[in-house]
């Protein structure tokens, strides 16, 4: 099944709810970055959370999320847009712990760390950026996104993200949900939401069992009849890197640096952090870039 995200309203229009299955997308990220179990879970959770923030944006806007904890994984970066395109990378892809956490799951908190920052940069188009930053509160990722939304954007939310990793480090299931209270939600609605959240199985297990974004939202809303589906968006790992972009980056290094590449290295190889694609530049190509540089 292809990955997709569903947007809906629930609780008499008093809550905005999103759910997504991202299994194939996170499989692609795992394959490209050769991530081990804990790194896979952390990257997959971050990418799914970023996907939800991207889905909140207008058509030409983009979101970049960076989680910088004090754990061995190092910084995690993901970006997404309103079209469901998502990419990401983790600084140390090879983190695995033989011990599980107290809940019997991969110890993502230990990998990410419990001290650090979650930063969100919104590219609003026209050269305008908005940056929000909150401290890491748990290192489990979902709770950190929840805290960011409540603190930086003043939106009471609940974000649940999960990745089920097989013993051979391949991805079995991935996805998540996001619920946001809208102005006017009553105490009764809040109580009902809390009750439904408390009985919700873990996201990765629901997806492993074959649940879809629609059925996850129905569980979240307390019944399919209580949902108003608004939109369904395809989700995929997409990277917009290109040789032209890397050429522009090389030009920005300046003539001296490019001359060094030509005379000492006799060429250059650039690798995209997000997708691991590599681009080779010959001496002749570098000479052309040298002419364009200042």
Curated annotation (Swiss-Prot):
UniProt KW keywords: Chaperone, Cytoplasm, Disulfide bond, Redox-active center, Zinc
Subcellular localization: Cytoplasm
Domain of life: Bacteria
GO terms assigned for molecular function: protein folding chaperone; unfolded protein binding
InterPro entries linked: Heat_shock_Hsp33 (IPR000397), Heat_shock_Hsp33_C (IPR016154), Heat_shock_Hsp33_N (IPR016153)
CC terms in the record's Gene Ontology section: cytoplasm
SUPFAM superfamilies the UniProt entry points to: Hsp33 domain (SSF64397), HSP33 redox switch-like (SSF118352)
Disulfide bridge positions per record: 239-241, 272-275
Pfam families for this protein: HSP33
GO terms of biological process kind: protein refolding
Keyword Disulfide bond: yes
Modification after translation: Under oxidizing conditions two disulfide bonds are formed involving the reactive cysteines. Under reducing conditions zinc is bound to the reactive cysteines and the protein is inactive.
Role summary: Redox regulated molecular chaperone. Protects both thermally unfolding and oxidatively damaged proteins from irreversible aggregation. Plays an important role in the bacterial defense system toward oxidative stress.
Family from the record: Belongs to the HSP33 family.
Protein name (database record): 33 kDa chaperonin
Organism from which the protein derives: Listeria innocua serovar 6a (strain ATCC BAA-680 / CLIP 11262)
Lineage: Bacteria, Bacillati, Bacillota, Bacilli, Bacillales
């Amino acid at each position: 099944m292809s990955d997709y995200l569903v947007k809906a309203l629930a609780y008499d229009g008093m809550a905005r709810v999103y759910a997504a299955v991202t299994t194939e997308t996170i499989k692609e990220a795992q394959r490209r970055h050769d991530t081990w179990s804990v790194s896979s879970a952390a990257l997959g959770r971050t990418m799914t959370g970023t996907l939800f923030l991207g889905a909140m944006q207008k058509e030409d806007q983009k979101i970049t999320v960076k989680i910088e904890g004090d754990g061995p994984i190092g910084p995690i970066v993901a970006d997404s847009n309103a079209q469901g395109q998502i990419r990401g990378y983790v600084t140390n892809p090879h983190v695995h712990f033989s011990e599980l956490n107290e809940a019997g799951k991969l110890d993502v908190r230990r990998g990410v760390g419990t001290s650090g920052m979650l930063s969100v940069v919104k590219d609003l188009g026209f050269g305008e950026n908005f940056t929000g930053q909150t401290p890491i509160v748990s290192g489990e990722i979902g709770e950190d996104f929840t805290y960011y939304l409540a603190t930086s954007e003043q939106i009471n939310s609940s974000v649940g993200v999960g990745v089920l990793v097989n013993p051979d480090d391949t991805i079995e299931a991935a996805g998540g949900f996001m619920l946001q209270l809208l102005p006017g939600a009553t105490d009764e609605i809040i109580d009902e939401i809390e009750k439904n959240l408390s009985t919700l199985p873990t996201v990765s297990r629901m997806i492993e069992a074959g649940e879809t974004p629609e059925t996850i939202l129905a569980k979240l809303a307390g019944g399919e009849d209580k949902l108003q589906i608004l939109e369904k968006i395809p989700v995929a790992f997409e990277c917009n890197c290109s040789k032209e972009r890397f050429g522009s980056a090389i030009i920005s290094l300046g003539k001296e640096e490019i001359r060094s590449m030509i005379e000492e290295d006799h060429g250059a190889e650039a690798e995209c952090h997000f997708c691991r694609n590599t681009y080779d530049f010959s001496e002749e190509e570098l000479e052309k870039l040298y002419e364009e540089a200042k």
